[in-house]
């Protein structure tokens, strides 16, 4: 079991968890030592989101890397997918992003990409953790690393997307964007300017403390309100590091990651093509049934975009994602990318005069109820085994009308209890039953 890594990097409350300057320095040195041990190119790329804690954590990380002899190219405040993109383009040994994604501003963390632009697999994470807990290594003969700022690399990312989609995007509707006061602030606007999109920007004034506060992909009431106020045709909401995207239609109705994935799957010829789709354990059953009825291969991965990616590679598919808004298209990148996904959607919506709502899955989706149960310990398979009988009873009552999922969060100290059913009342009833059992047996 991982000591430091969760489902999406390492994160926690700054100063009250492992997210401290000392740890970041050790992490940098650990990765730098592994880079040297494996003979990779001696430089890495680094970026950060807008949190006030980002700079001191970044420089602690840089000091550990430099001590190991690794050069660092700093992109400044940039979305996570841009770091992954640049890591691959410039053949860096690794890419780091100082971010806690959609978490509150008091948290921070780090996401780590391999030289191929993928998040680390479990085995490599274990190697990194072992090095963190080993002695700090200084480069021999004082051949320490250098540090360079290169904040204009964002232009290369924008031009790459324009080369691919410039001839396809001709969207005439009014768009509202919510940058979560995060890493996409100003960058998303520059991207839309390049495509000549008529847009209004909200939550794009970061001050170091307001990232994800009442805005962004985890607080869609903000973008819904903006769509109504501005009579917009489309709303696009990103999270703090812009690897998630949620959209709303002209009626301010939300389309989550599953819905976005379904739209891209329907028009995959515009988006590079795929032979199948990867969702997760959280993907609504309605989408699974839709894919099956249209003879589109569909599989569920574990929750977490790194697991979606693993299954994409394993099965040779190109497009996958999560309900939360991580959407991966291996035709264009190696990780969840809110900016690229937004452009793909604009390319699709440009192909007809239909409103955004017309691209949604027809009919009502299966109803989901999810309740987070706070716990002060890490949930293991032994804990879940204590609830197996209760889960079986709920599943028996649901029959073919729904399903049950109990899942420990990889980023928060909670157990997520999710029930899906054909009515909201039934989903809520069974979810509350299971929450009560969790409290009786685990709390």
Curated annotation (Swiss-Prot):
Modified residues (Phosphoserine): 101
Function summary: Catalyzes the conversion of glucosamine-6-phosphate to glucosamine-1-phosphate.
PANTHER family reported for this sequence: PHOSPHOGLUCOMUTASE (ALPHA-D-GLUCOSE-1,6-BISPHOSPHATE-DEPENDENT) (PTHR42946:SF1), PHOSPHOHEXOSE MUTASE (PTHR42946)
Co-factor(s): Mg(2+)
Processing and modification events after translation: Activated by phosphorylation.
Active-site residue list: 101 (phosphoserine intermediate)
EC number: 5.4.2.10
GO cellular component labels: cytosol
Family per record: Belongs to the phosphohexose mutase family.
Organism listed in the record: Francisella philomiragia subsp. philomiragia (strain ATCC 25017 / CCUG 19701 / FSC 153 / O#319-036)
Gene: glmM
Cysteine pairings via disulfide bonds: none
One of the protein's GO biological processes: peptidoglycan biosynthetic process
Keyword Metal-binding: yes
Residues the entry annotates as binding Mg(2+): 101, 239, 241, 243
Group of enzyme by EC: isomerase
Designated name of the protein: Phosphoglucosamine mutase
GO molecular function ontology, one term from the record: phosphomannomutase activity
Keyword Metal-binding: yes
């Amino acid at each position: 079991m991982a000591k430091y890594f969760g489902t999406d990097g390492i994160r926690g409350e700054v100063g009250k968890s492992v997210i401290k300057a000392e740890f970041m320095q050790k992490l940098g040195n650990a990765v730098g030592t592994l880079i040297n041990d494996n003979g990779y190119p001696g430089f890495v790329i680094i970026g950060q989101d807008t949190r006030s804690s980002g700079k001191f954590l970044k420089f602690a990380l840089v000091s550990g890397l430099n001590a190991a002899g690794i050069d660092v190219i700093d992109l400044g405040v940039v979305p996570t997918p841009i770091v992954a993109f640049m890591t691959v383009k410039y053949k860096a040994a690794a890419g780091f992003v100082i971010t806690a994604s959609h978490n509150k501003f008091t948290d921070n963390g780090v996401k780590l990409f391999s030289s191929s632009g993928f998040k680390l697999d479990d085995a490599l994470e274990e190697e990194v953790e072992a090095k963190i807990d080993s002695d700090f290594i200084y480069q021999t003969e004082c051949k320490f690393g250098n540090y360079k700022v290169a904040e204009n690399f964002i232009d290369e990312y924008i031009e790459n997307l324009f080369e691919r989609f410039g001839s396809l995007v001709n969207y005439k509707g009014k768009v509202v964007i919510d940058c979560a006061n995060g890493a996409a602030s100003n960058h998303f606007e520059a991207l839309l300017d390049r495509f000549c999109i008529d847009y209004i920007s909200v939550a794009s004034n970061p001050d170091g403390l307001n990232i994800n506060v009442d805005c962004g992909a985890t607080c869609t009431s903000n973008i819904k309100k903006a769509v109504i106020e501005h009579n917009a045709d489309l709303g696009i909401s990103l999270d703090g590091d812009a690897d998630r995207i949620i959209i709303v239609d002209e009626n301010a109705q939300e389309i989550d990651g599953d819905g976005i994935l379904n739209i891209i799957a329907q028009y995959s010829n515009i988006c590079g093509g795929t032979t199948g789709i990867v969702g997760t354990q959280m993907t609504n059953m309605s989408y699974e049934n839709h894919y099956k009825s249209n003879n589109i291969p569909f599989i569920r991965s574990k929750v977490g975009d790194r697991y979606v990616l693993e299954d994409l590679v394993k099965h040779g598919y190109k497009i996958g994602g999560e309900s939360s808004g991580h959407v991966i298209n291996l035709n264009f990148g190696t990780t969840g990318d809110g900016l690229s996904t937004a452009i793909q959607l604009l390319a699709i919506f440009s192909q007809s005069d239909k409103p955004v709502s017309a691209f949604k899955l027809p009919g009502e989706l299966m109803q989901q109820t999810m309740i987070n149960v706070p716990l002060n310990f890490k949930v293991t398979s032994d804990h879940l085994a204590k609830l197996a009988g209760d889960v079986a009873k709920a599943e028996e009552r649901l029959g073919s009308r729904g399903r049950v999922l109990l899942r420990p969060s990889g980023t928060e100290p909670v157990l997520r209890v999710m029930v899906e059913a054909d009515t909201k009342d039934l989903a809520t009833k069974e979810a509350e039953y299971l929450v009560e059992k969790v409290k009786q047996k685990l709390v």
